């Protein structure tokens, strides 16, 4: 199969980017590639052979049809208008045309200086590229909309962060890299015609069913609201904290993008802050749904020159309903409830209150809940709690609720095990792989990637054990 690339952004949106080539690293070498994703994309195995060098993965060559460019956008960061931002370290190499008619972006992170690098050096480090590759593939395996990682290249280039680190590149694959901040950029530059031009572009390429509809802009924004609300519900369900939900990190397609100081919950603490630069807790785990709406409000403001304010507000008013409907559906599945009753939220909230008081492990608690037998008063989860009386009280209510379900125990438990992962990407697991990779040993990186592909499978290794004390509630740097 020959890879085919289009250049829609390059050809249709002049003034939205700067064309430039990647800047290769010193002695770049491929250390990991995503064979499964490569197969899905039809990427020839020969491109990953050691004798071919870093090639396109290290920005040393381009594939036919690629027109590399850096996109310009702006955004609100931590609630404050930050002005022009843009691709400061990444370059959109091209858009691959797939056999099903869709396209995907090939975006090279760490590709060197661009006009939008500001005070940065245009580079990424091995630590951050490993973290993004692990997180994006973990989220994909959990069924959450996300960008993907295709390859990692390391090098002898030294990059200054808190300390000197190895320069690296990551090939990111996504349906689109359009962010809320793309629209904000031209709105604040008082160029509403370009905001509309970009809206027309994304509708044509990602919502073609509405391209000729008189209400296409309203229908499109309504769907952006719904996708964002659904994504927030997914994050909350699996215990994922993004850490830096600036408007320039919000995907117009409702994808999880820009993995930086993220973290999955260990102990259930709703105020968990994974980003050590988030001093006020703006992007804490429990605040994410509210921030999602705030970011949509900023997007709506940017679209107000050509969408009526009333229509924008009507769409925004649907956010909470979509969020709670999707979240409720997902959490009922985690509880093994196939039907819906009025008191289901009370059961869930009582469990969360108990978990929060005890610092119960979020992932392990729900996984073990899948071993419940509705006609047995015993639960293997009981030994996980110090407050046995509190657990017994909650479990009696939960078991009574299960008894009103017709689904047999074995079928319900199998269903629960298909939605409650045995394994998530805990920060300490990622850090262990990073530490070894920085010493030139990539075996753990490969092992961890392999394990993350099947998060719902039972395991008996430390990938599913409680984190060590040093690994709990890790806060991570924004630096990449």
Swiss-Prot record:
<feature type="binding site">
    <location>
        <position position="172"/>
    </location>
    <ligand>
        <name>ATP</name>
    </ligand>
</feature>
<feature type="active site" description="Proton acceptor">
    <location>
        <position position="248"/>
    </location>
</feature>
<dbReference type="GO" id="GO:0070733">
    <property type="term" value="F:AMPylase activity"/>
</dbReference>
<feature type="binding site">
    <location>
        <position position="122"/>
    </location>
    <ligand>
        <name>ATP</name>
    </ligand>
</feature>
<dbReference type="GO" id="GO:0005524">
    <property type="term" value="F:ATP binding"/>
</dbReference>
<keyword id="KW-0547">Nucleotide-binding</keyword>
<comment type="similarity">
    <text>Belongs to the SELO family.</text>
</comment>
<feature type="binding site">
    <location>
        <position position="88"/>
    </location>
    <ligand>
        <name>ATP</name>
    </ligand>
</feature>
<protein>
    <recommendedName>
        <fullName>Protein nucleotidyltransferase YdiU</fullName>
        <ecNumber>2.7.7.-</ecNumber>
        <ecNumber>2.7.7.108</ecNumber>
    </recommendedName>
</protein>
<feature type="binding site">
    <location>
        <position position="121"/>
    </location>
    <ligand>
        <name>ATP</name>
    </ligand>
</feature>
<keyword id="KW-0479">Metal-binding</keyword>
<keyword id="KW-0548">Nucleotidyltransferase</keyword>
<feature type="binding site">
    <location>
        <position position="258"/>
    </location>
    <ligand>
        <name>ATP</name>
    </ligand>
</feature>
<feature type="binding site">
    <location>
        <position position="86"/>
    </location>
    <ligand>
        <name>ATP</name>
    </ligand>
</feature>
<comment type="function">
    <text>Nucleotidyltransferase involved in the post-translational modification of proteins. It can catalyze the addition of adenosine monophosphate (AMP) or uridine monophosphate (UMP) to a protein, resulting in modifications known as AMPylation and UMPylation.</text>
</comment>
<feature type="binding site">
    <location>
        <position position="109"/>
    </location>
    <ligand>
        <name>ATP</name>
    </ligand>
</feature>
<keyword id="KW-0067">ATP-binding</keyword>
<dbReference type="InterPro" id="IPR054838">
    <property type="entry name" value="adnlytase_SelO"/>
</dbReference>
<feature type="binding site">
    <location>
        <position position="179"/>
    </location>
    <ligand>
        <name>ATP</name>
    </ligand>
</feature>
<keyword id="KW-0464">Manganese</keyword>
<dbReference type="InterPro" id="IPR003846">
    <property type="entry name" value="SelO"/>
</dbReference>
<feature type="binding site">
    <location>
        <position position="249"/>
    </location>
    <ligand>
        <name>Mg(2+)</name>
    </ligand>
</feature>
<dbReference type="GO" id="GO:0000287">
    <property type="term" value="F:magnesium ion binding"/>
</dbReference>
<dbReference type="Pfam" id="PF02696">
    <property type="entry name" value="SelO"/>
</dbReference>
<keyword id="KW-0460">Magnesium</keyword>
<keyword id="KW-0808">Transferase</keyword>
<feature type="binding site">
    <location>
        <position position="258"/>
    </location>
    <ligand>
        <name>Mg(2+)</name>
    </ligand>
</feature>
<feature type="binding site">
    <location>
        <position position="89"/>
    </location>
    <ligand>
        <name>ATP</name>
    </ligand>
</feature>
